[in-house]
Structures are given as C-alpha cells and as structure tokens.
Amino acid sequence: MNLVELKSKWNDVLDLLESRDRIAWIAYFDARLASLSDDVLTLHFVDAEKLSGAHDYKATRNDRIRGALEDAIKEVTGISLKIVEI
C-alpha cells in the first residue's frame, strides 16, 4: 500500500476509530498523512496546532490511543503500521 491508497481509505479508518473510541478519534481526526515508508506512517499535526488554541492533544496521543488507531488501520487496510508524529 502506498500513501495515496491509504489516504483514500483514511475516512473509513477514522469512522471505525470514532465508533470504537471517540477520544482516539478526537486525538487523530485532524492529522495529516505526511508519509508512508515500509511499515511506518508519519502523521503531521501542523493544522491542529494552529487551530487548537489552548487544547494540547499531543499528550492525549499515548500508547493506548495510538494503538487504537493502529488497530483501525489494520482492520480497514489489512496492514500493520507503526504511527510516528512530526
């Protein structure tokens, strides 16, 4: 799978994530998919940082929340990815 293919399925990933864990969805719904290399998906939050005001969701994106996103990606796409942030 390449980044373009993953982007085409991203709304399905987010919909599944929202149905399972609304906190995880809030933490990731405004992420930008920056790159996909091997099994590593890099997410960028520049827009989220500009618009979040006093809310800092970075601390919310802990191992459990990140794992929920990784699980949703695997279920929708069939591939296992590690999530990193820039």
Task: Label each region the model flagged.
Residues 1-86:
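Intrinsically disordered, low-complexity basic tails and flexible linkers associated
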